[in-house]
Amino acid sequence: MAQTLAMMSQFNGRKRVRKFFGKIPEVAEMPNLIEVQKASYDQFLMIKEPKGGRPDEGLQAVFKSVFPISDFSGTAMLEFVRYEFDAPKFDVEECRQRDLTYAAPLKVILRLIVFDIDEDTGSKDIKDIKEQGVYMGDMPLMTSNGTFIINGTERVIVSQMHRSPGVFFDHDKGKSHSSGKVLFAARVIPYRGSWLDIEFDAKDIVYARIDRRRKIPVTSFLMALGMDASDILSTFYNKVTYERVESGWRIPYSVDRFKGVKLVSDLVDAESGEVVAEAGKKLTARTAKLLVEKGLKAIRVSEDELLGSYLADDIVNYETGEIYLEAGDEIDEKVLKVLFDVGANQINILDIDHMSVGAYIRNTLKVDKNESRQDALFDIYRVMRPGEPPTIDTAEAMFHSLFFDSERYDLSAVGRVKMNLRMGLDCPDTVRVLRQEDIIGVVKMLVELRDGRGEIDDIDNLGNRRVRSVGELMENQYRVGLLRMERAIKERMSSVEIDTVMPQDLINAKPAAAAVREFFGSSQLSQFMDQTNPLSEITHKRRLSALGPGGLTRERAGFEVRDVHPTHYGRICPIETPEGPNIGLINSLATFARVNKYGFIESPYRKITDGKVTTEVVYLSAMEEAKHYVAQANSSLDSEGRFTEEFVVCRHAGEVLMVPRDHIDLMDVSPKQLVSVAASLIPFLENDDANRALMGSNMQRQAVPLIRSEAPFVGTGMEAIVARDSGAAISAKRGGIVDQVDATRIVIRATEDLDPSKSGVDIYRLQKFQRSNQSTCINQRPLVHVGDRIEKGDIIADGPSTDLGDLALGRNVLVAFMPWNGYNYEDSILLSERIVADDVFTSIHIEEFEVAARDMKLGPEEITRDIPNVAEEALRNLDEAGIVYIGAEVQPGDILVGKITPKGESPMTPEEKLLRAIFGEKASDVRDTSMRMPPGTFGTVVEVRVFNRHGVEKDERAMEIEREEIERLAKDRDDEQSILDRNVYARLAGMLKDKSAIRGPKGFEKGQKIDSTVLNNYPRSQWWQFAVDDEKVQNKIEALCNQYDESKEALQRRFMDKVEKVQRGDEMPPGVMKMVKVFVAVKRKIQPGDKMAGRHGNKGVVSRILPVEDMPFLEDGTHADIVLNPLGVPSRMNVGQILETHLGWACAGMGKKIGDLVDFYQETGDILPLRQRIENLIPDNDRNEPVRQYDDESLVKLAHQMRKGVSIATPVFDGAHEADINAMLEDAGLDSSGQVTLYDGRTGEPFDRQVTVGYIYMLKLHHLVDDKIHARSIGPYSLVTQQPLGGKAQFGGQRFGEMEVWALEAYGAAYTLQEMLTVKSDDVAGRTKVYEAIVRGDDTFEASIPESFNVLIKEMRSLGLNVKLGDAREFMAQQALPEVVEN
């Protein structure tokens, strides 16, 4: 090989190398997938205070908004100074195990200022200032994976989509009024505070509504703002001045007024009297302009043309003050006469032409009964607080507090920005209340809409919807808690001696802590994390919900809200959403999307400058994107980055257009920016129908982690990113060398980022057989060996469902698409026995069982091995403390933890009394309440945890667990200490070498040179006694010595803290003395009834597991693993599964070829054919691994990885085409049709025609038949109806419903029916008799009255009807008819 060794690079075998089919280069880095959660909460907490103090956001803003708090008399004020967090008491793992909340104590520094008030002048002087830190409860912290640990369970706070604050203009689409007239409305939505609606009614009168109460005319609202009638008219209308001339009136000519108007009468020049345009002519804009150029300044109109106009000002007699006519009056014959009589030669008319300017506000003013500001304020007060008599002060205060008081009304920065944008205002985003000009602006804009100018808003546009992430939700919740606290503080300030108290005495932090606890514990958005597999975790954290407090409800949400909107492109995934009632209300963030500081979702685009596509990336929200022309990521570019086509397909303002290339100013960064994480994991997504893709992305989240995970042959390149960001696979925090590895931990000696304050050792604890929230198994396996060099970010351990750092949700299996004896009818799946024998789809599930010993009234419960009436055989798995051993194989009914509960004293029989008198105290009366394995569960005990209350003596088992834990901690400490020693002494030896010493340990000659032999003569601990003559080096040695001592102390301190925590008792719920948790691992092999699926929405239930020899086989004798129905493909239009099958077939074929070449190399030592094959397979480009630079050893490692099948990546919308698949099939020496001759396993005959065969990636879903199938013999009954309970969890029965009863009636099966409705259900006496009869071996029984009949009678009696049951004949005899006497 011509390559030099310097060029060679190593392959460590710890990552999967994929051949990339994508043609489009990746220009933007994909943001961290859980950044949404982490960034938001970090911004809220701001744990580390930045220099110059914290900015006003998050927690800081909450405290600033509530404090300072003054008492009612103004003599004292409580100010907020700052807050700080202490270290959390327990780390994440400890909180998980002890059922605690992972939280840090919040300490708030408050300042109490007491004033002296001068009674005469009212001036204040500061009398006293006290500052104090006050504990304000615990604040939950987010783990590094973006989750919260609340009471020991992992929870996720889902982000909420809601309508952005701001102003929205809309209409009712003609639905409100029978005439179908479109009624416009505007709504001002604040972040918190009252909503303001301004709307038209069917008569075109404009009304205002506050908080959806009764409507009032908008002019009343404007009057309440301090305007009068003439202000209102002059604000909304222009004036035209009419001057009286001899034959009519003269008005100025304006182009705007006449352009586009059809003339009703001749247009006469006022100066010359000539007609410049005849009646009936339509003036275009150009003609109207020409008239001005010809010198037309004013025109003359007749008196008739004034009729129907409106006066702009009052007509007043200035001497007497008498008002002849009011502003807004309509001019009719009467008014003209008045004008003539009073000699008005010049009047102002409102410029209303009923075409482009309507008289809506003027008409509203005329309808409005309120004349003054006071009337208007009273009217608003009565609407808001009906039944209370208003005074001017209360009405004014109430109106002010509605929209203009920052404590009650907050538009928020977002609301102000949106309002500015929509209405073209320029107001800083610190002004968060409404201003008079805002309200006037909204009314003006609404009137313009009615006049046909402007556009209404689309409320489903993502520019009008924003995301509230964790931080913001938490901020709102905490504000509620603080406001509750504020009231209590004010009251307490008034009731105590303010001079003597400290801030601590005024504050009761319970309301704030309760608000936090309530939010995390019971809010609709705080959800139990879906932890089935790493993908389901990540998806849950990236979820956007429109439901929840302040959001929509399922019932009210219409079709529009749920539908995909053009602005979703690159922001919200159009595919991934649940099926069912939540469809479209719960969405997923797209892969590249991020949320900006205002809460709007942004998507990245490449900038285009001078027609050249650059690699500069900008993030834009939906509003900002609307004005750009955006090309798709797959538009073809030349080598310089210019578009090759003259016309390019692009998006603009929600439309898809073809535009000239020089118009385009942005381009998508990647084809997968359109979809979410789950959808981007589906290869050939572009060949699947959207409905099936939806099912595919949803079902990947339900895949159970298997014992042996295997990455897909056909991936999309997203697998590694998901595994890394989900935290399932462990990546190295910093570079170093592996020092120790075992199954439970990896110890790495750091070689970079060696900060003296940090330890030079990284210990990574692996999770072994831990239970997830969904009872799947979390197990991590190391990938590194001792001595390996590690770079920062390398994957060092695989987790659940990951394989060499790639997400691996299922297995690659050999599939044949063909019907087989009806066993794949209706999507059923036929499996080979090999799948079961080789544990291909075997998963481990961990069940948790918990038992608590409480202090009861009759005495304490006890956990013990000494259980009454239980055979020794049943106790075989218990230790002396009565707790099951680890490793015990348990089955239904086995005792896991022995427990006895005191029983009430029962009266003694004479015999018992005698025995008691002879033998003394009898064994106390206890009953067996041991915890047993539930029916249908077999497994192995993998872990036992024992928790004791403070002060309760620990049993042997608890002590043993404690000893093991302390030994583990000591081992960690010792390993870290030994690495620290090695590092420090190596550095010390390097400093001392070849230096002459002025002092040394005993027996050392002064001035001697120090070399390795000298050092080896003394134990290492004595090396510190050397002192060298070089002062600089000596100072370094002393610094190293100090640092070493500090590190040792810190290590010992950490160890002692942890030991103390282990030895300390546990916090328990009230009444619980001791608690035991037993974890049982259940191994679930695949079996008929389990649900399986591919990644393309192709799901089915296993119908039969066939012996290997009966499965169809290939010419070389390989049997198919799975047989699927070909009819499942055409109607469902998910052709992606067929393409995946072909490509998987090619991957396996190629793997086989590479395997043969590896064998050839091992026999002959000739690596050239292998190198050529791999280099041809994985060409050199920026997406592929540089295999040309691998040395021979690395190449063979890679070839071994590829033996089973070559891994490839076909990114969504940029993947392999049919030609690529054909080429790869031919390269692997396979038929390009992808079909082969199959032979029947039972007869050995070939099937009639060729069959599509290949490798498909199948998942086993978390719908296992073991969890669902269930049978009841005798079990619990409902208390009232005495009918058996329902459901597996309650060990219930099967419901025999109304229609089933009809079926038995139709058969005439009277006795069967009677049995069903009585003894098998709620006939208490009857079922007891049946039981006794069966025990006797008898089969006769008699039914009596069912309990539900008694319930009915009781119900009737409660209504006052006394129903009695008796014999009908007796009843009739008592009611004998009286004789009829004839007269």
Swiss-Prot record:
Keywords, A to Z?
Answer: DNA-directed RNA polymerase, Nucleotidyltransferase, Transcription, Transferase
- Tell me which Gene3D superfamilies the record gives: 2.40.50.100, 2.40.50.150, 3.90.1100.10, DNA-directed RNA polymerase, beta subunit, external 1 domain, DNA-directed RNA polymerase, subunit 2, domain 6, RNA polymerase alpha subunit dimerisation domain
List the GO biological process terms: DNA-templated transcription
Does the UniProt entry include the keyword Transcription? yes
InterPro entries linked:
DNA-dir_RNA_pol_bsu_ext_1_sf (IPR042107), DNA-dir_RNA_pol_bsu_external_1 (IPR019462), DNA-dir_RNA_pol_su2 (IPR015712), DNA-dir_RNAP_su2_dom (IPR007120), DNA-dir_RNAP_su2_hyb_sf (IPR037033), RNA_pol_bsu_bac (IPR010243), RNA_pol_bsu_CS (IPR007121), RNA_pol_bsu_protrusion (IPR007644)
Q: Name one GO molecular function term.
A: DNA-directed RNA polymerase activity
Q: Top-level EC class, please?
A: transferase
Q: Which domain of life is it from?
A: Bacteria
Q: State its Enzyme Commission number(s).
A: 2.7.7.6
GO cellular-component term (any): DNA-directed RNA polymerase complex
What is the role of this chain? DNA-dependent RNA polymerase catalyzes the transcription of DNA into RNA using the four ribonucleoside triphosphates as substrates.
Q: Which PANTHER family does this entry report, sorted A to Z?
A: DNA-DIRECTED RNA POLYMERASE I SUBUNIT 2
Q: Which NCBIfam families match?
A: PRK00405.1, rpoB
In the record, the note on similarity to other proteins reads: Belongs to the RNA polymerase beta chain family.
Assembly description: The RNAP catalytic core consists of 2 alpha, 1 beta, 1 beta' and 1 omega subunit. When a sigma factor is associated with the core the holoenzyme is formed, which can initiate transcription.
Q: Which protein, by its recorded name, is this? A: DNA-directed RNA polymerase subunit beta
Gene designation per UniProt? rpoB
